């Protein structure tokens, strides 16, 4: 079967933003203008098409990244059909994991900001994630009809707070209730969208006289940015020659793809103005799969290989999300990087080292699905019927095995105990938690060995609320929930050499395992690093992985208070064995014993999650807010001026001190202040707090 749309006309984009910037409404409008949804769904009516879980519609926030495929020919039907695969990403900070894994598989992004509140803490998080994956992006400043909306102020914040180089390609005409359209700075015309048909048609008109001067000034800025794309254009510009519209667009595209500039547009999705031009900008300025560097991976022999966006290369895809669908079971969302795969084909999961067969392949429009026979390089689709695939796994051709870069997922910071209400709920709860954990790598389930309780941990209170809510709705499991607990961790600060010897002699065959380990801190965030320095066969090859396994299992229970241990490097440098008595089990136990002994000698410490907190407050209450943060062991990192005389206080505060903060902030500031919080890093706790934690766990 031939390809319907050439890959050069594909755009895989994400729509990212912080909670209230109007991202879902923007996506809804995109679906409306591209002809996919005939009635515009409003978020505040709980009817948006992309938000397809019940909890999303109730809370008016997007939790899971729904993927959808649409086609666009341009506002003026000036292009051939382009296929746009859109991933709508959540804006709430507890779900940054969803954003992270979406950005991993996208080629470009549209970042939506609110015209009045501008760059908010969550926007910074999303921006940093997009920087990490080198995703080219354009900006849509939405809600220009809102009180306090100011396009150029937001552009300024993008420059100063995010360290980007924004280049406006539009200006707003009027703001707040007077917002009536935009000036296109490339064409130097006013765009007037027709309100009678919800903005489906438009006209170009002359720029209003009172805006002529401002438009000239920003047009100059835009041409200058374009000229910097090449020496040739710069010479032309400096000699006073006019750059043609095609030259300007080509130059802006080049610089956007190189992540040198970020083009800025504006509008109001709710008022049906501006989204149409954003779609044009996606086609003109964001990359096709062939415009981004080839994805790197490693083959079976650990050699680095690349996969190019080409149907003739071997098949390779990344599973970036697992979702449970009430009708078909498990859906595996994947981004195909190279090659072609048909329904019924056998493929290889190179991370799990297992074969899988594609039962059916569907392309989704929010939660409606359309079956397809095959998918090709550049496609985003979902496969039904894969047995054992986790987020981040690579699916590839059995004859050209490759592991694409793995995704990194954050450590959970908050933990609660859940217990089923009835015996019947007990079994169902196990199944439900297993499925939810497969969908979401930032959510973990474990059993407390001493109390036998089931503990679930995640990225924040809202994250766990939604998990409990989904157990009830999707799996009919009723459960009682304990008080949230902080997910402490342990690590070591010193270095030591230790011996672990396990000997058991009880008639017949005994057990014998003997190891010498050097235990030391690994690089921050490196996790567990195991180094094998055995020479001369002091420990036989076949037992070495057992030693590592023994250490790793022991790391689940730290020596101080039984919390998991982070960032340790263990070097196995000596040991001994007996031909008859040695076994994998004996060496596993020896490794575990040595680690336990070594961790006690290597200055063990307890770590606690430190949160990045931003409080926005009227100036009158600033002293109270700062005083309260200091009392909560917070470190004030800086203060900024917000909009409308508000102050923004940035601090790092231990999570353990932040429970109930929302209520206390409300009462301290008569409900005028708001805050946002996200995980920053693990920090060492002081001795007296460590003693208290150890005593509580006693």
Curated annotation (Swiss-Prot):
Any one Gene Ontology BP term: ribosome disassembly
A Pfam family hit: EFG_IV
Domain (tr-type G) ranges: 8-290
SMART domains per UniProt: EFG_C, EFG_IV
HAMAP family: EF_G_EF_2_B
Family classification: Belongs to the TRAFAC class translation factor GTPase superfamily. Classic translation factor GTPase family. EF-G/EF-2 subfamily.
Protein name: Elongation factor G 1
Phylogenetic placement of the source organism: Bacteria, Pseudomonadati, Pseudomonadota, Gammaproteobacteria, Vibrionales
């Amino acid at each position: 079967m031939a390809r319907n749309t050439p890959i050069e006309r594909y755009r895989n984009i994400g729509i990212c933003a912080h909670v209230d910037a109007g991202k879902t409404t923007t996506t809804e409008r995109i679906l409306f203008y591209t002809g996919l949804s005939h009635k515009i769904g409003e978020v505040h009516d709980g009817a948006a098409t992309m938000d397809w879980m019940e909890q999303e519609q109730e809370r008016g926030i997007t939790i899971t990244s729904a993927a959808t495929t649409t086609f666009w020919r341009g506002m003026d039907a000036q292009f051939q059909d382009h296929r746009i695969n859109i991933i709508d990403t959540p804006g709430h900070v507890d779900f940054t994991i969803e954003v992270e894994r979406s950005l991993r598989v996208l080629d470009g992004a549209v970042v939506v900001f609110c015209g009045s509140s501008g760059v908010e803490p969550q926007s910074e998080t999303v921006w940093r994630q997009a920087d990490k994956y080198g995703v080219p992006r354009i900006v849509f400043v939405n809600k220009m009809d809102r009180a306090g909306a100011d396009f150029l102020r937001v552009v300024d914040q993008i420059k100063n707070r995010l360290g980007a180089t924004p280049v406006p390609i539009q200006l707003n005409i009027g703001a707040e209730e007077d917002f009536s359209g935009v000036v296109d700075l490339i064409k130097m015309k006013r765009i007037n969208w027709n309100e009678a048909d919800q903005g489906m048609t438009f006209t170009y008109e002359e720029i209003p006289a009172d805006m002529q001067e401002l438009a000239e000034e920003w047009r100059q800025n835009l041409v200058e940015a374009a000229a910097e794309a090449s020496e040739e254009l710069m010479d032309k510009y400096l000699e006073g020659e006019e750059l043609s519209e095609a030259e300007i667009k080509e130059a802006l595209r080049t610089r956007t793809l190189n992540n040198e500039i970020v083009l800025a547009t504006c509008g109001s999705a709710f008022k049906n103005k501006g989204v149409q031009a954003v779609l044009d900008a996606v086609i003109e300025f964001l990359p096709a799969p062939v415009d981004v560097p080839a994805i790197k991976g490693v083959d079976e022999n650990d050699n680095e290989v690349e996969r190019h966006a080409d149907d003739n290369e071997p098949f390779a895809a990344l599973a970036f999300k697992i979702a449970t669908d009430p009708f078909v079971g498990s859906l595996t969302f994947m981004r195909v990087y190279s090659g072609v795969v048909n329904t019924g084909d056998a493929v290889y999961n190179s991370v799990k080292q297992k074969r899988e067969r594609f039962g059916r392949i569907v392309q989704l429009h929010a939660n409606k699905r359309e079956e397809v026979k095959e998918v090709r390089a550049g496609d985003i689709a979902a496969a039904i019927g894969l047995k054992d695939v986790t987020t981040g796994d690579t699916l590839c051709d059995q004859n050209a095995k490759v592991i694409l870069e793995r995704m990194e997922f954050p450590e959970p910071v908050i933990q609660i105990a859940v217990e089923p209400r009835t015996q019947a709920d007990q079994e169902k709860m196990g199944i439900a938690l297993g499925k939810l954990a497969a969908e979401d790598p930032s959510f973990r389930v474990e059993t407390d060995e001493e109390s036998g309780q089931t503990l679930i941990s995640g990225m924040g209170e809202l994250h766990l609320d939604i998990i409990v809510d989904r157990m009830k709705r999707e799996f009919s499991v009723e459960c009682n929930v304990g008080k949230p607990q902080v997910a402490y961790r342990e690590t070591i600060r010193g270095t030591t050499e230790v011996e672990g010897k396990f000997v058991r002699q009880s008639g017949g065959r005994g057990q014998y395992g003997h190891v010498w380990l050097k235990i030391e801190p690994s690089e921050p965030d490196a996790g567990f690093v195991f180094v094998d320095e055995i020479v001369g066969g002091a420990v036989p090859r076949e037992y070495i992985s057992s030693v590592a396994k023994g250490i790793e299992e022991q790391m689940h229970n730290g020596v101080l208070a039984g919390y998991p241990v982070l960032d340790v490097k263990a070097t196995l440098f000596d040991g001994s064995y007996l031909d008859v008595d040695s076994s994998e089990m004996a060496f596993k136990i020896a490794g575990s014993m040595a680690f336990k002994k070594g961790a006690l000698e290597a200055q063990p410490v307890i770590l606690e999650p430190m949160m990045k907190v931003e409080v926005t407050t009227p100036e009158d209450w600033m002293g109270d807010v700062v005083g309260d943060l200091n009392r909560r062991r917070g470190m004030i990192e800086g203060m900024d001026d917000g909009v409308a005389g508000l102050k923004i206080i940035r601090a790092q505060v231990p999570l353990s001190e932040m429970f109930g903060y929302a209520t206390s902030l409300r009462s301290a500031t008569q409900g005028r202040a708001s805050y946002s919080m996200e995980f920053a890093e693990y920090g060492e706790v002081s001795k007296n707090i460590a003693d208290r934690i150890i005593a509580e766990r006693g």
